[in-house]
């Protein structure tokens, strides 16, 4: 699956067309149904505005919100998004009480002059995800004929399909892969994701560094496997570094995370790194704690001293940070997935802050820095540096699967240029 040859929305004539856009409006709501963080709505604005400005007859937005499990549940209605979207767009938005059916088709077909229509939650229908849950919480597969009918129902609402929901691109859901229109284009968000991941995975400026954190080696094995033939260096940090240190160098790790299953593959990873001439950088010192808490007794340890029993490593220490800074400064492409420490707790956030500073410096001096979703994206948001990094991915699971070398159904379904 080539990432760089997908049809962008800018190559499609939208004049007079009904433009059906899959957005990601899966936003958090408080108990009064107010949107508490509109970031995902803001993210979709460039694509929505582009369709309006380029003469679309109707701009039809479809999304999921939460996990209603294939049944109508007012708690997960997309209606609270309407006032937020109206304010951001500066124009009225029509809400359709269902995402398919004759009434919805009538609303869409009557629209003119770029009228924006937001459809109700796709996941109120079991046919979106392909299954629902019964009263006992067991999965019930949706009937194939019903799924086909639902997909036809969505297809009937547009002349052109645009996907701007990268966060759901790894799911083969009906709204991602089942809309059967001649032109299926990438919106601006998806286009940016694909461009940056193509830069890293298909034609990186070298040296190419990957920084991988996370708890378990076994969770990241596919990722490491797919990246080793592509990168020049690899920083292994976070909880999974302890499995490497104990297995390779017999460092005493106290009560730190140890991944028994992962430890069996550490040797293979090191051999493969040698084969591809990849330098693996591991931490050499640690910030320790007697419990997983902000008010823990904090200590320091090195490889030589080891971490004493009763203590665990929750961050890497200043010497490790220096190693990371040097490696980051030498790289031209940096892909970062997983923080070095438990940044949510203040005493164990300093290596994450220092790594982030180094990444920002690298981006400012012209390197391409990509943050791959999930916890690391949370870090970038927490320290308000998203605009200082070349690209912060919006899709945790989707970016991880892409980096693991998997094909994303939502991307594969798009037309080629």
Swiss-Prot record:
<feature type="binding site">
    <location>
        <position position="66"/>
    </location>
    <ligand>
        <name>(2R)-3-phosphoglycerate</name>
    </ligand>
</feature>
<feature type="binding site">
    <location>
        <position position="122"/>
    </location>
    <ligand>
        <name>(2R)-3-phosphoglycerate</name>
    </ligand>
</feature>
<keyword id="KW-0324">Glycolysis</keyword>
<feature type="binding site">
    <location>
        <position position="220"/>
    </location>
    <ligand>
        <name>ATP</name>
    </ligand>
</feature>
<feature type="binding site">
    <location>
        <position position="375"/>
    </location>
    <ligand>
        <name>ATP</name>
    </ligand>
</feature>
<comment type="similarity">
    <text>Belongs to the phosphoglycerate kinase family.</text>
</comment>
<feature type="binding site">
    <location>
        <position position="171"/>
    </location>
    <ligand>
        <name>(2R)-3-phosphoglycerate</name>
    </ligand>
</feature>
<keyword id="KW-0067">ATP-binding</keyword>
<feature type="binding site">
    <location>
        <position position="215"/>
    </location>
    <ligand>
        <name>AMP</name>
    </ligand>
</feature>
<feature type="binding site">
    <location>
        <position position="215"/>
    </location>
    <ligand>
        <name>ATP</name>
    </ligand>
</feature>
<feature type="binding site">
    <location>
        <position position="25"/>
    </location>
    <ligand>
        <name>(2R)-3-phosphoglycerate</name>
    </ligand>
</feature>
<keyword id="KW-0496">Mitochondrion</keyword>
<keyword id="KW-0418">Kinase</keyword>
<feature type="binding site">
    <location>
        <position position="219"/>
    </location>
    <ligand>
        <name>Mg(2+)</name>
    </ligand>
</feature>
<dbReference type="GO" id="GO:0006094">
    <property type="term" value="P:gluconeogenesis"/>
</dbReference>
<dbReference type="InterPro" id="IPR001576">
    <property type="entry name" value="Phosphoglycerate_kinase"/>
</dbReference>
<keyword id="KW-0460">Magnesium</keyword>
<feature type="binding site">
    <location>
        <position position="344"/>
    </location>
    <ligand>
        <name>AMP</name>
    </ligand>
</feature>
<feature type="binding site">
    <location>
        <position position="238"/>
    </location>
    <ligand>
        <name>CDP</name>
    </ligand>
</feature>
<feature type="binding site">
    <location>
        <position position="23"/>
    </location>
    <ligand>
        <name>(2R)-3-phosphoglycerate</name>
    </ligand>
</feature>
<dbReference type="GO" id="GO:0006096">
    <property type="term" value="P:glycolytic process"/>
</dbReference>
<dbReference type="GO" id="GO:0005829">
    <property type="term" value="C:cytosol"/>
</dbReference>
<feature type="binding site">
    <location>
        <position position="343"/>
    </location>
    <ligand>
        <name>CDP</name>
    </ligand>
</feature>
<dbReference type="GO" id="GO:0005524">
    <property type="term" value="F:ATP binding"/>
</dbReference>
<keyword id="KW-0479">Metal-binding</keyword>
<feature type="binding site">
    <location>
        <position position="216"/>
    </location>
    <ligand>
        <name>AMP</name>
    </ligand>
</feature>
<dbReference type="GO" id="GO:0046872">
    <property type="term" value="F:metal ion binding"/>
</dbReference>
<feature type="binding site">
    <location>
        <position position="214"/>
    </location>
    <ligand>
        <name>CDP</name>
    </ligand>
</feature>
<dbReference type="InterPro" id="IPR015824">
    <property type="entry name" value="Phosphoglycerate_kinase_N"/>
</dbReference>
<feature type="binding site">
    <location>
        <position position="375"/>
    </location>
    <ligand>
        <name>Mg(2+)</name>
    </ligand>
</feature>
<feature type="binding site">
    <location>
        <position position="338"/>
    </location>
    <ligand>
        <name>CDP</name>
    </ligand>
</feature>
<feature type="binding site">
    <location>
        <position position="220"/>
    </location>
    <ligand>
        <name>AMP</name>
    </ligand>
</feature>
<feature type="binding site">
    <location>
        <position position="215"/>
    </location>
    <ligand>
        <name>Mg(2+)</name>
    </ligand>
</feature>
<feature type="binding site">
    <location>
        <position position="239"/>
    </location>
    <ligand>
        <name>ATP</name>
    </ligand>
</feature>
<feature type="binding site">
    <location>
        <position position="170"/>
    </location>
    <ligand>
        <name>(2R)-3-phosphoglycerate</name>
    </ligand>
</feature>
<feature type="binding site">
    <location>
        <position position="39"/>
    </location>
    <ligand>
        <name>(2R)-3-phosphoglycerate</name>
    </ligand>
</feature>
<feature type="binding site">
    <location>
        <position position="376"/>
    </location>
    <ligand>
        <name>ATP</name>
    </ligand>
</feature>
<dbReference type="GO" id="GO:0005739">
    <property type="term" value="C:mitochondrion"/>
</dbReference>
<feature type="binding site">
    <location>
        <position position="64"/>
    </location>
    <ligand>
        <name>(2R)-3-phosphoglycerate</name>
    </ligand>
</feature>
<feature type="binding site">
    <location>
        <position position="219"/>
    </location>
    <ligand>
        <name>CDP</name>
    </ligand>
</feature>
<keyword id="KW-0963">Cytoplasm</keyword>
<feature type="binding site">
    <location>
        <position position="238"/>
    </location>
    <ligand>
        <name>ADP</name>
    </ligand>
</feature>
């Amino acid at each position: 699956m080539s990432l760089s040859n997908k049809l962008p929305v800018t190559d499609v004539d939208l004049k007079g067309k009904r433009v059906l856009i899959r957005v990601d409006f899966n936003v958090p709501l408080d108990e009064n149904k107010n949107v508490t963080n509109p970031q995902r709505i803001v993210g979709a604005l460039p694509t929505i505005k582009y369709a309006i400005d380029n003469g679309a007859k109707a701009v039809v937005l479809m999304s999921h919100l939460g996990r209603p499990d294939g049944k109508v549940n007012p708690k997960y209605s997309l209606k609270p998004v309407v006032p937020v979207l109206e304010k951001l767009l500066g124009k009225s938005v029509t809400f359709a009480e269902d995402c398919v059916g004759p009434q919805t088709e009538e609303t869409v077909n009557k629209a003119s002059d770029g009228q924006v229509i937001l459809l109700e939650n796709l996941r109120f229908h079991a046919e979106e995800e392909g299954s629902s849950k019964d009263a006992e919480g067991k999965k019930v597969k949706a009937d194939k004929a019903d799924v086909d009918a639902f997909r036809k129902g969505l297809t009937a609402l547009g002349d052109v399909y645009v996907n701007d929901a990268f966060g759901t691109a790894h799911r083969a859901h009906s709204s991602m892969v089942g809309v059967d229109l001649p032109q299926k284009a990438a919106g601006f968000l998806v286009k940016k994701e694909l461009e940056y991941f193509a830069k890293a995975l298909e034609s990186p400026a070298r040296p190419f560094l990957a920084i991988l954190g996370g708890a378990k080696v076994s969770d990241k094995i596919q990722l490491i496997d797919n990246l080793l033939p592509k990168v020049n260096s690899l920083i292994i940090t976070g909880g999974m570094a302890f499995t490497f240190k104990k297995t390779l160098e017999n460092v005493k790790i106290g009560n730190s995370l140890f991944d028994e299953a992962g430890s069996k593959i550490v040797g293979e990873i090191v051999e493969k790194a040698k084969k591809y001439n990849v330098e693996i950088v591991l931490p050499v010192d640690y910030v320790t704690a007697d419990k997983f808490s902000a008010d823990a007794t904090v200590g320091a340890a090195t490889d030589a001293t080891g971490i004493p029993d009763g203590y665990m490593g929750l961050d890497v220490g200043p010497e490790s940070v220096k190693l990371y800074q040097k490696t980051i400064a030498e790289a031209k492409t940096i892909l970062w997935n997983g923080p070095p420490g438990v940044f949510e707790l203040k005493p164990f956030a300093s290596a994450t802050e220092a790594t982030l500073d180094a990444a920002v410096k690298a981006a400012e001096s012209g390197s391409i820095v990509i943050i791959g979703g999930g916890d690391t994206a949370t870090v970038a948001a927490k320290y308000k540096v998203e605009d200082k990094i070349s690209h912060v991915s919006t899709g945790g699971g989707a970016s991880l699967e892409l980096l693991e070398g998997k094909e994303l159904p939502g991307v594969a379904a798009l037309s080629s240029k």
